[in-house]
Amino acid sequence: MARYRRCRSQSRSRCCRPRRRCRRRRRQSCRARRRATRCCRRRYRLRCRRY
């Protein structure tokens, strides 16, 4: 959870905050979703949009 908040403060990009979508789409588990939070870093942004 700590990572999540940090990510939020760094940038408000969609990938950083949507916890709700994670429940809607069961393609990826919430866990995988949280990993995508790294997308705040520029490297992961593109990947993040996939989720």
Curated annotation (Swiss-Prot):
Free-text tissue specificity from the UniProt record: Testis.
Gene Ontology cellular component annotations, sorted alphabetically: nucleosome; nucleus
Keywords: Chromosome, Developmental protein, Differentiation, DNA condensation, DNA-binding, Nucleosome core, Nucleus, Spermatogenesis
GO molecular function, one term: DNA binding
InterPro entries per UniProt: Protamine_P1
Localization (cell): Nucleus; Chromosome
Family to which the UniProt record says this protein belongs: Belongs to the protamine P1 family.
Function statement: Protamines substitute for histones in the chromatin of sperm during the haploid phase of spermatogenesis. They compact sperm DNA into a highly condensed, stable and inactive complex.
Annotated protein name in UniProt: Sperm protamine P1
Organism: Trachypithecus johnii
